[in-house]
């Protein structure tokens, strides 16, 4: 059962300019430590760093739309983090207000599954999020919130 769907498209150069202008203040406010570590491993090429951050920014926007809140109502940027499953597939881990909102949307006896697709083609980055409620046994096969 689909709980929510969200998508976002962003100009990578916009994120690059914000990083240039606001630096650590922006990065600390929006991204988790794991997201920052992943982006900084690509530091040899600044456009790769900007694209990595832009995809994660778009994923957070898409996830907040799938939650039905946007970035408000107790859902904040760092409450949503992009992580990769062992096979490399991206998903979201929710904490704080985002997790509270997800729990409220998930029917009793079911588990939330978050499917995420992220991509970029300079100068654009895109993310698409589908949040589904699945039976507990199906949780083993996919990504879930933690």
From Swiss-Prot:
Enzyme Commission no: 2.7.8.7
GO cellular component, as recorded: cytoplasm
Top enzyme class: transferase
The entry's keywords: Cytoplasm, Fatty acid biosynthesis, Fatty acid metabolism, Lipid biosynthesis, Lipid metabolism, Magnesium, Metal-binding, Transferase
SUPFAM superfamilies in UniProt: 4'-phosphopantetheinyl transferase
GO biological process: fatty acid biosynthetic process
Catalytic activity: apo-[ACP] + CoA = holo-[ACP] + adenosine 3',5'-bisphosphate + H(+)
Top-level taxon: Bacteria
Annotated Mg(2+) binding sites: 8, 61
Keyword field contains Cell inner membrane: no
Molecular function (Gene Ontology), one example: magnesium ion binding
Cofactor: Mg(2+)
Entry function: Transfers the 4'-phosphopantetheine moiety from coenzyme A to a Ser of acyl-carrier-protein.
Protein name (database record): Holo-[acyl-carrier-protein] synthase
Annotated organism of origin: Rhodopseudomonas palustris (strain TIE-1)
Source lineage: Bacteria, Pseudomonadati, Pseudomonadota, Alphaproteobacteria, Hyphomicrobiales
